Amino acid sequence: MDRHRDFGKDRLRDKEFTEKLIKLNRTAKVVKGGRRFSFSALTVVGDQKGRVGFGFGKAGDVSEAIRKSVERAKRSMVLFPLKDGTIPHEVQAKFKGSLVLLRPACSGTGIIAGGTVRAIMEVAGATDVLSKSLGSNSAINVVRATFGAVAQLMDARKLARERGKALVDMWG
């Protein structure tokens, strides 16, 4: 009986998240009888209200790899501070060979970003962001660099509270 109740709650929780598959990769291991294929999937999951996470899953089947990556993405959710559909300030982050620059944009600009960064911004709920990816264009490295940049973003209310100042004094 309890199992059915939990299943219903999970279904409701799943409806609030948007999932995007960033990369699906097939690898082959050559064995005595031929080739054995396995798949890896990189996905981002977000609620389009500022929560976003990424996951990487591997399995012998495509659907299983995607399911694993979505599960891991839901467990690694982080808060994405948004201010009027954009990020509060300019930020950059590097992960291994990838460098990602994120800049706030005026309303109506849209998401100007490469495929990997665009997917993250869309599931996070950002509507106006400028982005540039430099260096390695490896999907996992760009995702980790983007999440590093997101981690550096400061929420105006939280920062004002920490400094003991009024919100108007901080950002106007």
From Swiss-Prot:
Coiled coil: none annotated. One of its GO terms (biological process) is translation. It comes from the Bacteria. It holds the Pfam family Ribosomal_S5. One of its GO terms (molecular function) is structural constituent of ribosome. GO terms for cellular component: small ribosomal subunit. Residues 17-80 form the S5 DRBM domain. Keywords: Ribonucleoprotein, Ribosomal protein, RNA-binding, rRNA-binding. InterPro entries: Ribosomal_Su5_D2-typ_SF, Ribosomal_uS5, Ribosomal_uS5_bac-type, Ribosomal_uS5_C, Ribosomal_uS5_N, Ribosomal_uS5_N_CS, Ribsml_uS5_D2-typ_fold_subgr. The N-terminal domain interacts with the head of the 30S subunit; the C-terminal domain interacts with the body and contacts protein S4. The interaction surface between S4 and S5 is involved in control of translational fidelity. Part of the 30S ribosomal subunit. Contacts proteins S4 and S8. With S4 and S12 plays an important role in translational accuracy. Located at the back of the 30S subunit body where it stabilizes the conformation of the head with respect to the body. HAMAP family: Ribosomal_uS5_B (MF_01307_B). Belongs to the universal ribosomal protein uS5 family. This is Small ribosomal subunit protein uS5.
